[in-house]
């Protein structure tokens, strides 16, 4: 149901952020929080060379985008993100989806759906 509140967290390459923001805005997502984060998954970091010496970077720079939706269907957000982010390569990212039981807008005291609009 579209009126349920759902948190969607997307962790992906920094280079995909602008395209993702644009695509999400086109389907009605007009609020999100963005973090620069470090992490790794299957790729386990990368090997680099500097002045002939090889070294490993264990934590890779990523971007984490969070949003709580109640009017835009979760499947629309996921499908949009997948179409923008998927390259078929390791490092495309992850999408986490979880229910939200309560939202409170601090400025007005509005709660739940009204706090998100």
Model-predicted regions and their roles:
Residues 1-117:
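Positively charged, small/polar-rich N-terminal and surface patches that mediate targeting and assembly
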């Amino acid at each position: 149901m579209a009126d349920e509140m759902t948190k969607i967290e997307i962790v992906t390459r920094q280079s995909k952020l602008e395209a993702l923001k644009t695509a999400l805005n086109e389907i009605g997502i007009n609020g999100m929080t963005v973090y620069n984060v470090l992490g790794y998954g299957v790729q386990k970091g990368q090997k680099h060379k500097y002045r002939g010496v090889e070294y490993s970077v264990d934590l890779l720079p990523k971007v984490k985008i969070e949003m709580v939706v109640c009017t835009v269907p979760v499947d629309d957000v996921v499908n949009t993100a997948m179409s923008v982010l998927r390259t078929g390569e390791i490092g495309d990212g992850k999408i986490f989806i979880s229910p939200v039981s309560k939202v409170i807008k601090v400025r007005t005291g509005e709660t739940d759906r009204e706090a998100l609009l």
